[in-house]
Amino acid sequence: MATAPVLNQTTNGTISQVIGAVVDVQFPGELPAILTALETENGDTTLVLEVAQHLGENTVRTIAMDGTDGLVRGQEVINTGAQISVPVGPKTLGRIMNVVGEPIDMRGPVGADKANPIHAEAPAFVDQSTDAAILVTGIKVIDLLAPYAKGGKIGLFGGAGVGKTVLIQELINNIAKGHGGVSVFAGVGERTREGNDLYHEFLDAGVIAKNEAGEAISEGSKVALVFGQMNEPPGARARVALSGLTMAEYFRDEEGQDVLFFVDNIFRFTQAGSEVSALLGRIPSAVGYQPTLSTDMGNLQERITSTTKGSITSVQAIYVPADDLTDPAPATSFAHLDATTTLNRAISELGIYPAVDPLDSTSRVLEPRVVGQEHYETARKVQETLQKYKSLQDIIAILGMDELSEEDKLTVARARKIQKFLSQPFHVAEVFTGIPGCFVQIEDTVASFKAVVEGEYDHLPEQAFYMVGGIDDVVEKAKKMAEDA
């Protein structure tokens, strides 16, 4: 009687072809399963390859997690028989790691007790939590018009240079520093300089703990950092978000914590996928993206969720190519998010920072049941006033302000004050602006804007509303302006 062949998952193979970040490996026996990690020596480093396709003729096509310079045909490849795994647990806190969980902060091995595979199933429906509560950010325009949900997914959309990274750093400053739990930051395909700045900022703020000699230590640290930056091959950029998420999932599932998960930038994750996709021989779809765009995004986003054990609140910066929100990459992200904060170049050109578009940003939790009736009505009145002003702008441009009715003139004056009042000095931008940063409590934000839309501050000059915190600061600034005049 014939017996089934035994799967030999640990046969070693040899490299048969190298095409950029894609490496073909031939095996004499059974082929390793898809997503298996293979290892080969490249100089004095170990290169990790992830199996992506079975090509037939005993060959698998793999994606390299680091540079392939120096690889030669016929070189031996070891099959690990397991997926890429990254260290998880308290020992990862205060450390900087790469996509395969190796430390890149020159502080020796991570020494974690456990390593988890980076590919995992999303939590089942029955395990997911449906509670709705607001996460206070201290940023007026966000808390008022597009509040963030605790345990929700938040997207910061914006083109090049409109302030996504500064906004994410301010959110880290306002939320992560005061947050009792842990945070994980995944730097996906962004500038190495920004990652370095962030690390030193965390050290200065005490989010990463230091010993008496001033060196970073894990004990007492609150954040783990995982980087696959712009200079990395596409394999690393396509997987580093999953590595960071795996670390965050451990704190949620095993320790029952409320975790903050920051990703900068989700677009680079998609971009890396499209670079690899072409090398894997897939036919591109719309605008040259990979045909598996929705699947790749879904596999990542569905794992970022809150369960009955703990929560993951995720803040993701999403680059918008050529300021086009209908581009497939940002458009695919929209469906997964609970709140979207859209940054607009036209607003940044007016000198209003954060350059958040108050009419284009949305939130699932902006409803009376969650935020309360007063907050909801104030937010809607603010949006209504700004929308009226927007529709009057064409008339103003052609005929001038004098042709407007008295009521419309009042609407325009209030809208301009609101627009200026939505600006705010940031703690992380203090070195550039010279203005101390402000954290505004949500109650103050709602009360201030309610008073402005009801006309209680119509007598104050609009410049007094620019780059301040609460309404008391506006009154103070107006007084100072009057004295200087």
Swiss-Prot record:
Binding residue positions for ATP: G158, G159, A160, G161, V162, G163, K164, T165
Say what the protein does: Produces ATP from ADP in the presence of a proton gradient across the membrane. The catalytic sites are hosted primarily by the beta subunits.
Into which family does the record put it? Belongs to the ATPase alpha/beta chains family.
The record lists the organism as Erythrobacter litoralis (strain HTCC2594)
Q: Which InterPro entries match?
A: AAA+_ATPase, ATP-synt_VA_C, ATP_synth_F1_bsu, ATPase_a/bsu_AS, ATPase_alpha/beta_chains, ATPase_F1/V1/A1_a/bsu_N, ATPase_F1/V1/A1_a/bsu_N_sf, ATPase_F1/V1/A1_a/bsu_nucl-bd
- Which named protein is this? ATP synthase subunit beta
Q: Note the topology in the membrane.
A: Peripheral membrane protein
EC number(s) of the enzyme?
Answer: 7.1.2.2
This protein's GO cellular component annotations are: plasma membrane; proton-transporting ATP synthase complex
